[in-house]
């Protein structure tokens, strides 16, 4: 396995670790509605950071975006919006299925759809079937799915042991939302694929290869911001017990604390895709769709490890922890299989 591929896998791991930890600051926010908290964090992660970093990277910000016609930008934006819909469905999936089953189904579907649909759309799915490297990476995808399934089972055992139940368990509604979440969340993978002309244009301007994907986030995350912020603002305006005015009528120290914590959560959320771009840049071009598989499987891996570090599994007993450990090992094996496939 080459150093470039090893570093690509490593950066995807770092990005996934940030994704697994980003909600921790949000949990410390007090006396704010979820909608206000999510909006403040979202403004930082989907608007301020993509624009600020792109402005630093690009020699002429407006000239860069002005060179693309609508036929290039619109698919990137719409796939970003598609991914934004997946974000919203994610929370609803957890409500109706519970954390373990919801994450397992949603992540499993988005891993398959986001990874395998891209080569199908590009017309090079035969690379997966008819080359040794392609078959190895395909095997890695399915091993990763097995790992996700094992971690999901560990979560179910933990919830059963600790008496944790879904907020409003509804299997039919939850499964529908989980499938929708999995499909729509793959929009980020599709957006990155559609944004290749933007990446190439950034490279032509002399932007470091590690950073060439970052300017496209202005458009991708703009689509996600439209959906997420629109959803939050509509609820803040229409739901009677929600009020942004009330949220900002608290004591000033608490408001400042909530803003800073939400902004920190937004920063950590953005960093997952900052390092995703670094990892993506190191993956061989013919296997770039594997970035999504690495990100999502590492997200499950890191989520389990973070839970252990935070002692969320302390009272779960030995069996759930043993099953979780097995699932994490399987995901690590899957990443190595994919790495070897990309190197062959």
From Swiss-Prot:
Origin organism lineage: Bacteria, Pseudomonadati, Pseudomonadota, Gammaproteobacteria, Enterobacterales
Record's keyword terms, sorted: Cell inner membrane, Cell membrane, Membrane, Sugar transport, Symport, Transmembrane, Transmembrane helix, Transport
Membrane topology: Multi-pass membrane protein
Family: Belongs to the L-rhamnose transporter (TC 2.A.7.6) family.
Keyword Ribosomal protein assigned: no
The name this protein goes by in its record: L-rhamnose-proton symporter
First-listed, main subcellular location of the protein, grouped into a coarse class: membrane
Single annotated GO MF: symporter activity
CC per GO annotation: plasma membrane
Transmembrane segments: 4-24, 38-58, 68-88, 101-121, 137-157, 175-195, 214-234, 259-279, 290-310, 321-341
Function field: Uptake of L-rhamnose across the cytoplasmic membrane with the concomitant transport of protons into the cell (symport system).
Reactions catalysed, as given in the entry: L-rhamnopyranose(in) + H(+)(in) = L-rhamnopyranose(out) + H(+)(out)
Location relative to the cell: Cell inner membrane
NCBIfam families with a match to the protein in the record: PRK13499.1-1 (NF010021), PRK13499.1-3 (NF010023), RhaT (TIGR00776)
Listed InterPro entries: L-rhamnose-proton_sym_RhaT
């Amino acid at each position: 396995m080459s150093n470039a591929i090893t570093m690509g896998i490593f950066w995807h791991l770092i990005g996934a670790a940030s994704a697994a930890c980003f909600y921790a600051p949000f949990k410390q926010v007090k006396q704010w509605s979820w909608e206000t908290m999510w909006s403040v964090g979202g403004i930082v992660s989907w608007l301020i950071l993509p624009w600020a970093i792109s402005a630093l990277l690009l020699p002429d910000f407006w000239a860069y975006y002005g060179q693309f016609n609508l036929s290039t930008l619109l698919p990137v934006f719409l796939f970003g919006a598609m991914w934004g819909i997946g974000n919203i469905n994610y929370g609803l999936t957890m409500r109706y299925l519970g954390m373990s089953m919801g994450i397992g189904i949603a992540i499993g579907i988005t891993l398959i759809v986001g990874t395998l649909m891209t080569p199908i759309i590009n017309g090079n799915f035969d690379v997966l079937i008819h080359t040794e490297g392609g078959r190895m990476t395909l095997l890695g995808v399915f091993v990763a799915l097995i790992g996700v399934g094992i971690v999901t089972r560990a979560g179910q055992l933990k919830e059963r042991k600790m008496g944790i139940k879904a907020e409003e368990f509804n299997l039919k509604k939850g499964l529908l939302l989980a499938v929708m979440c999995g499909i729509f969340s793959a929009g980020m993978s599709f957006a990155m694929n559609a944004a290749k002309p933007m990446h190439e244009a950034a490279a032509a301007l002399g932007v470091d290869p590690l950073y060439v994907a970052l300017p496209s986030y202005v458009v991708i995350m703009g689509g996600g911001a439209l959906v997420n912020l629109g959803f939050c603002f509509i609820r803040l305006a229409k739901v009677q017990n929600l009020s942004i005015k009330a949220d900002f009528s608290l004591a000033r120290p608490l408001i400042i604390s909530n803003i800073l914590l939400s902004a920190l959560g937004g920063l950590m959320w953005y960093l997952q895709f900052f390092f995703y771009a670094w990892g993506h840049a190191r993956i061989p071009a013919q296997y770039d769709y594997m970035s999504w598989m690495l990100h999502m499987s590492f997200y499950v891996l890191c989520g389990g490890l973070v839970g252990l570090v935070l002692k969320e599994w302390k009272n779960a007993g030995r069996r759930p922890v043993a099953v979780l450990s097995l699932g994490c090992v399987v995901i690590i094996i899957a990443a190595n299989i994919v790495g070897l496939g990309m190197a062959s």
